[in-house]
Structure formats: C-alpha cells, structure tokens
Design a protein with these regions (language model features):
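Acetyl-CoA-dependent GNAT
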Residues: 1-46, 57, 63, 118-120
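Short acidic/polar active-site loop segments enriched in Thr and Asp
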Residues: 7, 70, 94
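Conserved G/P- and acidic residue-centered "switch" motifs that form tight phosphate/ATP-binding loops
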Residues: 51-53, 107
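Acidic/histidine-enriched, glycine/proline-rich intrinsically disordered or flexible terminal extensions
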Residues: 120-129
Length: 129
C-alpha cells in the first residue's frame, strides 16, 4: 500500500512497543472511486481511549487530503464498537449506513457500520485529474 502512495502508520511508545496502527487504501478498485479511500485503525486493547486511535486517524485524514482524495469511508465491523464509532464521529465522520448481519466475528453475526467524511473540498468541486 505504501508503495502505491497510500498511508500506513504505526504508533509506538518510548520503549518501541506497538500501541496501534492505521492505514488507508482504495475504497474500491474501480476508476469511479479513485478519489475515495477507506481507513482502518487498530489500537491495543489496554490503551484504548487514550488518544492513539484519534492521532492515527487524524494523520490518515491529513495524508489523504494531501494526496488529493475527496472522501474517506470507515467500515466498522461491529455496530457495538462504540469506541471506533465515537472516534470517527469526533473527527467529522457521519454514519452513512448499517449493513445488517454482514459480518461474522467471535462466533456471532455483527452489523457493519459505514461512516463517511469529506476530505478537502469534498464534493463541492471536481478534483484535478
């Protein structure tokens, strides 16, 4: 992904221990979605709620905007993941939809929440090709 110009970030503490990581990648491979990215962020369980995830996603947003992308999508694989949903809301994402029982995690069906945030000018203007 990094070789293709997409961001991959790792947060570490002073001792070099991994706290979390995040990345963005193309939302879909079709040309129509070339200005839209999907973010993913993962934070170690014992340090959630301490700002690591927010710092990672904020940096992903900044890098996506610098790349000229116009929309960022978050696909949250469990509607009960209030931490991730709240994190994305705090950074300007809004809920775009819920896919019922679209995922299977830990032996149960989960609803998948899709969230969206405009980047830069968003849909206000056409991007430079």
């Amino acid at each position: 992904m990094a070789a293709a110009g997409f961001a991959w970030l790792v947060a570490v503490d002073e001792a070099g221990q991994v706290l979390g990581y995040g990345y963005f990648a193309p939302f879909r491979e079709r040309s129509a979605y070339r200005f839209t990215a999907e973010d993913s962020v993962y934070v170690r369980d014992d340090i959630r709620g301490q700002g690591v995830g927010k710092a990672l996603v904020a940096e992903l947003i900044a890098r996506a905007e610098a790349k000229g992308l116009r929309q960022m999508i978050a696909v949250i694989g469990d509607s009960e993941n209030v931490g991730s949903i709240g994190l994305h809301i705090s950074l300007g994402f809004r809920q775009a939809g819920v896919l019922k029982a679209a995922g299977m995690k830990f032996g149960r069906w989960v609803d998948v929440v899709t969230m969206q945030r405009a980047l830069g000018e968003g849909e206000k203007t056409l991007p430079a090709e």
